[in-house]
């Protein structure tokens, strides 16, 4: 059984579950994967609580322990910034936790040439803590939007998705995407799990899967989860 620690935010956790189901293509109810979604929406905000490391760790760990007690074979966390706490969570949890940034990196190796520019759209917390740099700096050059675009467009789009204002979020994120394309990025990581919802708003699942520009961590993590579930 797959354990999903969600609630960061709720829309992002549901987006992951939706992609997990669509990837599976079960012909009957019984053909779909068993999973537990713990929508733990009371976890303190990650980007604004980086300095309260232990407080956030405790809440995340409680979520992982809940899933472990419910007999989950492994755990996934559809939140990029939460992976700042990944190492301590894995040390204190008795089942594997799949690392989202690592899976995105392993996917990128297959899609991009060494030293390629890869754009990263993410929370300021994800950028500051380097959860993607930890992997990508080995083979790629990560590129970010300038500060004004980060503040006016990326942060705004993330907030709008959390508020359920998807059309507004889709409009807000466009200048950030265009700026990274102008910087000749080969791919763009949607490094906050709210952002695929904004980018792919109202698009079919087939178009999401075939995107040549964007790397969707939720979709990549869902693929990795299905492989591990079936192994």
Predicted features along the sequence, with ranges:
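Non-catalytic structural scaffold of enzyme domains
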Residues: 1-231
